[in-house]
Every structure is written in structure tokens, then in C-alpha cells.
Regions:
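Conserved active-site alpha-helix within GNAT-family acetyltransferase domains
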Residues: 129-130, 152-170
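A short beta-loop-alpha structural element at the N-terminal edge
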Residues: 38-52
Length: 196
């Protein structure tokens, strides 16, 4: 059992990794062909597909920041495979295709959330929000959640604010890329409800 499996078991959160069915809305471009989205725990066998999706989804971030060397675009298959040992990966599946993913790990009371990705054809339809909700459920005993995104990624920042995240500080990743770190704290009542 990995550290993350043990941490999640201690939080009694394994129930949230079962398949969750979510009805899709009808849209153009093939969206109507997908009647159900599954949110599942991703396995190491999904690493190749998750990495390909990551590189596709982060192209817009690279263009926005004028930097094609951002870590999501330079990550290797072996690097992402090694992350499965220390992080929980979720995937959003439509038909037989992974259309979204998110990963997280917990250290003490803080859950570090990272690499929220949704296929460009499926963005703006609530899949990112759903993945975020599921990862927060999975780490139900975390006291706080922390993540970061580019200061230029205004749509990401809006999403995280809607979900209760607040800006903490900013930090330069490179001459072209400035990151904003955000956090969400659970109040006592929310923690109590999630753990019942």
C-alpha cells in the first residue's frame, strides 16, 4: 500500500474513488455522442494517455505565457509514472477516451493539487469542476488544499475562486511565467459533514 493509499484509507475516503456517472449536455462536435462521463482513479497503465492529454491541454498555457518549456510540456513518461507512487490520479472518461485528469498528494494536513487538465474540445463544460470536487472528496481529512497556476490563466483563477480558493502569493517560474499560489481551507463544519 502506497503512502497516498494509506492516507486516503485513514481519511475513510476510498468511497469517492468509485465510478461517478455524470450526464453530459448535448453540444456540437461529438459531445452528444458521450452520454456519460466517468470519474475514476487513474492507474499507471493510463500514464501514456494522461501525458499525451497533458501536453495537448497545456499548449494553450505555453502560448499564453510565450514559453514552450513549461514543466507540463517537458515531463517524460518515466517522470509521470513515478508520480503514481506518491500521488492520486483521477481521470474523466467519455466512452473509451480520457478527456480530463487531476493529481494530488497530501502531506500532513495539506493536499497539494496539481495539473488539472481537460481536453480542449471538452473545456468549459464543468469537467474541471467535477474533477476538483472529486479530489477534494478523496482527501476528505485534509485541512487545506493548495495549488498554483499562471497569473495569466484568468479562466483557471476564476474557476478556483468559484470553488473557494484564495490567492496566497506569486512567484516567478521563469522570465516569462509567473505563478499564483492559491489555497482553500476547510472550516470545521465542512470537515465534519464530509467525514460523516
Amino acid at each position: 500500500m502506497s503512502y497516498q493509499d494509506e492516507a486516503m484509507s485513514n481519511c475513510d475516503a476510498s468511497h469517492s474513488l468509485h465510478r461517478v456517472r455524470t450526464a453530459c449536455q448535448t453540444h456540437g462536435g461529438g459531445w452528444e455522442k458521450c452520454m456519460v462521463i466517468f470519474i475514476d482513479r487513474a492507474s499507471p497503465g493510463d500514464a501514456n494517455e494522461v501525458l499525451a492529454l497533458q501536453k495537448l491541454a497545456y499548449q494553450s498555457e505555453a502560448e499564453l505565457n510565450g514559453d514552450s518549456t513549461i514543466p507540463p510540456l517537458t515531463q517524460t513518461l518515466s517522470e509521470i509514472q513515478s508520480e503514481y507512487e506518491t500521488k492520486v490520479f483521477l481521470k474523466a472518461v467519455c466512452g473509451d477516451k480520457i478527456i480530463g485528469s487531476l493529481r494530488a498528494s497530501q502531506n500532513s494536513g495539506t493536499c497539494q493539487v496539481g495539473r488539472l487538465i481537460v481536453h480542449p474540445d471538452y473545456q468549459g463544460r464543468g469537467i474541471g469542476t467535477l474533477l476538483m470536487k472529486r479530489i477534494e472528496e478523496a482527501f476528505s481529512c485534509a485541512e487545506r488544499f493548495e495549488l498554483f497556476t499562471s497569473t495569466k490563466s484568468t479562466s483557471n483563477i476564476r474557476l478556483y475562486r468559484r470553488m473557494g480558493y484564495q490567492e496566497l502569493y506569486e512567484e516567478d517560474l521563469s522570465p516569462n511565467v509567473r505563478l499564483v499560489f492559491m489555497e482553500k481551507r476547510r472550516c470545521y463544519e465542512e470537515t465534519r459533514v464530509w467525514n460523516t
